[in-house]
């Protein structure tokens, strides 16, 4: 499915994105990564772009020519930071999710995957997917959780 296909992974230097890049490389994909973080001990044969995805033109640029887009980017922080500076997380996430979805659509790609977060759920021992809209994100993840939920609705 991915052999010789152009694949974009946003957040490809992060914990999930990096693993995804390895899987896609093993499948023979041609990978482009978009991230704010400089890659450390990164893969060869991966096209890397250090870009701010809150800027729409950057999203257009990284989406151009892609067959598949995996949007796994997020904002890394401790659970305490969104409580201290909530809008520093909520607004950029809404902006880069919206920008990426629009740029992907405008690029003509036929395949886009948006990843959410466990932060969309309220605290529970066992999280059930059907329960996500019956409750609210925990206080620790309130605005990041809501921004991911909004991304789910957009996607």
Across the structure, where does each feature detected by a protein language model lie?
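Rossmann-fold cofactor-recognition segment
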Residues: 43-56
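Short alpha-helix in the Rossmann-fold core of NAD(P)-dependent oxidoreductases
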Residues: 89-97, 113-116, 147-148
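NAD(P)H-binding glycine-rich loop region in Rossmannoid oxidoreductase-like domains
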Residues: 53-92, 106, 123
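N-terminal Rossmann NAD(P)H-binding glycine-rich loop of SDR-like oxidoreductase domains
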Residues: 5-27
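Conserved glycine-rich Rossmann-like NAD(P)H-binding loop of the short-chain dehydrogenase/reductase
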Residues: 29-37
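Active-site Tyr-X1-5-Lys
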Residues: 139-155
